Amino acid sequence: MADDATTARDYRETVFLPDTPFPMRAGLPKKEPEILEGWAALSEKGLYGAVRQKRQAAGAPLFVFHDGPPYANGAIHIGHALNKILKDFVVRSRFALGYDVDYVPGWDCHGLPIEWKIEEQFRAKGRRKDEVPAEEFRRECRAYAGGWIEAQKTEFQRLGVLGDWWNRYATMDFTSEAKIVEEFHKFLATGQLYRGSKPVMWSPVERTALADAEIEYHDHVSPTIWVKFPVVQGSDAAVGAKLVIWTTTPWTIPANRAVSYNPDIPYSVFEVTALEEGLEFEPWAKPGDRLIIADKLAEDVFKAAKVASWKTVEAVDCEGMVLAHPLADLDSHYGYAVPMLAGDHVTDDAGTGFVHTAPGHGADDYQVWLAHGHREIPDTVDPDGAYYPHVALFAGLKVLETEGKKVGKFGPANGAVMEKLIEAGNLLARGRVEHSYPHSWRSKAPVIFRNTPQWFIRMDHAVDSLDGKTLREVAVQAIADTAFYPDGGRNRIGAMVETRPDWLISRQRNWGTPLAMFVDKHTGHPLNDPEVNARILAAIREGGADAWFTRPDADFLGAHDPAQYEKITDILDVWFDSGCTHAFTIEGRADSAWPADLYLEGSDQHRGWFQSSLLEGCGTRGRAPYKAVVTHGFTMDENGEKMSKSRGNTIEPQTITKESGAEILRLWTAMVDYQEDQRIGKTILATTTDAYRKLRNTMRYLLGALAGFDEEERVTDYDQFPALEKYILHRLWELDGQVREAYQSYRFSDVIRPLIEFCQGDLSALYFDVRRDSLYCDRPDALKRRAYRTALDYVFDRLTIWLAPLASFTMEEAWTTRFPEAGPVAYRVMPERVDAWRNDAEAARWAKVEKVTSVVTGALEVERREKRIGSALEAAPVVHFADEDLLAAFEGLDAGEVFRTSSATLVAGDAGAFRVDEVKGVSVDPNKAEGKKCARSWRILPEVGTDPRYPELSLRDADAVAYWDAGRG
């Protein structure tokens, strides 16, 4: 008879081993384009169109998601990627929740950045902008924007972003421009539009007015001066003294027309008695000088002026006081009287307690000037940021440089004004101060307040079509009626709207939508003739905004005399453009609806698109064009620093997609708290990639473990499920509620993070590990194995649909690997939550079981470290329970299976050698397993060899092999 060693059977063929074509290595950069190609082939509008068709056929409720338009200029950056991926999460999750989602991507096309680019292109060809016909210039702008729309669209689609790309909108489309003008005409018709000469934020570099939304603040170092105004009328103590003002804009002194004071602030005449000694320069203050300053600020002023001591002469009342301009002695141009004006904007927190008032260069200055009955606003600075020729002493000097290497820097005006003040004997002191200063958000150059005629929309004008309410009142109520995510957004935009000035909507540029209207040359009133407006709109629909600039006025005016009217050639604020997108994208379309269910953009859009859309909607329709607003933060580098090419800390989405795949970028977006600023970099992406691998491995295991699963194998009676399966089903029930609620509230990290934890904890560390032996070695018809595979089927089913909106490429790959004929995973709707799966008792039980398991695992680790055992299957621990509640948790369980050992014994008492401080009432004796090693399952049991048919196997394995042999025979 042959030796047993030569005849021992190889049982590997009788063991089930997970098998799947789903690869461990994702190869995302190669795989994703293949998936995109498959999606594109599903319908004329790709996967997006195919899903909409299915939802509409099923009568699904409509969800309208309106896209905030990115600017059509340049390749997308990481901020664009974050924004569009978040939007894709919304689209796909709403599809998964059973909605028919309307999402039309769009682009903002007008404005200065493109205009600058085209100017550069013409300069490179030796042509100045003023030498290029406006029609040709605008045509080049349109072509430039169109090219970037196509480029960005391709990049967004590569990220897996779904939408109606085939009907994308653009603010430069002829129909869009016509609709924008139509919306503008509504403000004209309701009396909300007016022309005003007032100081506005002006960018000399860009040569145009800017709205609040186009301003950003940066730290800036400015000169600061204390200036003396001689008192020519007032009390005896005041006349002959000099009143002191403080300003950080010396260049505005030639525009001074008044000084403001606050009647509630005490002021006095102070006399200089001594100067500081040992100075390297001679102070401009002199002993005997009498100066008028707010009492609270006198010490600060004298310190700046290097005055060592002073005395109070007497208190003064500023009402009725008249001053001379500090430059009056140098030129008669400044020989006018300078009145004192009471104003509550004046404080004694800093400065001198007085405010130098130049009504053409400040909002408060302008308001207080008008409030006191003055109407004439002086023009001091021209559109290029230089003094007009009529400004004595300073004609032609630049306030701000607009050309050459110093573009965006303050020019010689400040220095020249200070020198003349010294010459006049009216500069008391000067210094420098770092403060927050307004800059253009496009050019990044400082801006100035400048008086100029502009067109405005009134915020506080009662409008009949708004039930007699003002635009501000309607907008404030609309904010209260809107849902904000996070909720703090309501207060942020609310504070802005409550205090904002009238909406400045005119710009003095070429590339944009025109304020297409005529103004009566005699009355200054805009022409509001419906027939004229209809002709204007028809022309723009046919030929775009160019028609307004190229066609004769008579084409529009009809019976009106062209000689009587001025055609307005200003263009609209680009924020007005984008604020109208709801009117030509969602309103009036058969497969959409107004208002939108959702707007989603960066938090800076509280003062941008959210606000312009709000004001446009409220001004024309009496409500916001959205029901809810979601905001996200900004992308920073790994150290929390702002990204910039000069710092070399940028990371491009194209690079991530090429090297790692768009899925990694999508997963990073899902995992961050997007409502705050997010950090991204190589180290962070490496962590994201690691999380992705674990997620992919979970899906791969599920696919392999479910190989061959069919409905005959399914366990349909919940009561037949073992305790562990009931716990896993409970976790699915629990996660179902969390996932739905998180998606409904746009909290995507609250979807991905619990699911990753579920995969790594409940599944990989517990469920897969505990049931591995059953999956591999139980006979196929064994109830426990069938229950396991049934539960895995439910897990796979839920994970794929829950994760599909986020990890879209991988869930598509996993789903179609298992069900190649079922269509894309995006076709699916989340199955209803199965309340029968809720089992709080099993959840409580397995929390206790896991505590006990941690003690057993700790004991076995010691045994491995001491090399007394190799694997856990070599152990048969005895677990002692002083805590009866913990012992009761194991009722009906196979403790050896739970501990991943060959067997285990549970006893009441407290005699075990190994303990863990964190788990009271449990101790373990990590005994070695006794018996023989099963040649199939490798468990060491006394029963191995007791079945004569299979002497190398345990009884369970012998039965399984017999079943297998019978099936093969």
From Swiss-Prot:
GO biological process, one term: isoleucyl-tRNA aminoacylation
Residue positions of motif 'KMSKS' region: 642-646
Catalyzed chemical reaction(s): tRNA(Ile) + L-isoleucine + ATP = L-isoleucyl-tRNA(Ile) + AMP + diphosphate
Any one cellular-component term (Gene Ontology): cytosol
Chain positions of motif 'HIGH' region: 70-80
Keywords: Aminoacyl-tRNA synthetase, ATP-binding, Cytoplasm, Ligase, Nucleotide-binding, Protein biosynthesis
A GO molecular function held by the record: aminoacyl-tRNA deacylase activity
InterPro entries xref list: aa-tRNA-synth_I_CS (IPR001412), aa-tRNA-synth_Ia (IPR002300), Anticodon_Ile_BEm (IPR033708), Ile-tRNA-ligase (IPR002301), Ile-tRNA-ligase_type1 (IPR023585), Ile-tRNA_ligase (IPR050081), M/V/L/I-tRNA-synth_anticd-bd (IPR013155), Rossmann-like_a/b/a_fold (IPR014729)
Binding site for ATP: K645
Record keyword Amino-acid biosynthesis present: no
Keyword Nucleotide-binding on entry: yes
EC number: 6.1.1.5
Localisation per UniProt entry: Cytoplasm
UniProt-annotated binding residues for L-isoleucyl-5'-AMP: E601
Quaternary organization: Monomer.
Record remark: domains: IleRS has two distinct active sites: one for aminoacylation and one for editing. The misactivated valine is translocated from the active site to the editing site, which sterically excludes the correctly activated isoleucine. The single editing site contains two valyl binding pockets, one specific for each substrate (Val-AMP or Val-tRNA(Ile)).
Protein family: Belongs to the class-I aminoacyl-tRNA synthetase family. IleS type 1 subfamily.
Entry function: Catalyzes the attachment of isoleucine to tRNA(Ile). As IleRS can inadvertently accommodate and process structurally similar amino acids such as valine, to avoid such errors it has two additional distinct tRNA(Ile)-dependent editing activities. One activity is designated as 'pretransfer' editing and involves the hydrolysis of activated Val-AMP. The other activity is designated 'posttransfer' editing and involves deacylation of mischarged Val-tRNA(Ile).
Name by which UniProt lists this protein: Isoleucine--tRNA ligase
Source species of the chain: Caulobacter vibrioides (strain ATCC 19089 / CIP 103742 / CB 15)
Lineage: Bacteria, Pseudomonadati, Pseudomonadota, Alphaproteobacteria, Caulobacterales
Gene name tied to this protein: ileS
